[in-house]
């Protein structure tokens, strides 16, 4: 038998007594049955409130609030090529305007080996500023033919693969180059 909480044990005993009394007794008037049903509902309500479960109306309210917050957030027109062109020209941009979207500028990355890892040739490479640092990791793994490569920006920290190369370059460039040191094992910390 599955162990029950104290209140459940008491309620199950009273429930079995109620069932046995109702089966052996004469039919009760509808008012008495309605009162006992009301009492049982109140008991269940108390037990549920002790569990502190969110009611369905609470979850519906939170869902509605989240949807209204999402709808209230405005999306800037600059995020869409179509909307930005429609705002400036008063209509949809032509296909020639769409093909003329400027490519992000390229940034220079200088690779410096740490320890006994070989030098990557060329030492300075250019990459699109919109690329993630994960692309740099893939490039180094292929060039060095290693399974794992640990990279450090300016010998100080290891960037995450999701970080943007352009942002790293803007913040940590030295002589207009992002200095990336690399090694086969963990070098710092």
Curated annotation (Swiss-Prot):
There is a cross-link at residue 189 (Glycyl lysine isopeptide (Gly-Lys) (interchain with K-149 in ATG5)). It is found in: Preautophagosomal structure membrane. GO terms for biological process: autophagosome assembly; autophagosome maturation; autophagy of mitochondrion; glycophagy; piecemeal microautophagy of the nucleus; protein transport. Residues 10-39 have a biased composition (Polar residues). It comes from the Eukaryota. Signal peptide: none annotated. Residues 60-72 have a biased composition (Acidic residues). One of its GO terms (molecular function) is protein tag activity. Its main location: membrane. It is a peripheral membrane protein. Ubiquitin-like protein involved in cytoplasm to vacuole transport (Cvt), autophagy vesicles formation, mitophagy, and nucleophagy. Conjugation with ATG5 through a ubiquitin-like conjugating system involving also ATG7 as an E1-like activating enzyme and ATG10 as an E2-like conjugating enzyme, is essential for its function. The ATG12-ATG5 conjugate functions as an E3-like enzyme which is required for lipidation of ATG8 and ATG8 association to the vesicle membranes. Forms a conjugate with ATG5. This is Ubiquitin-like protein ATG12.
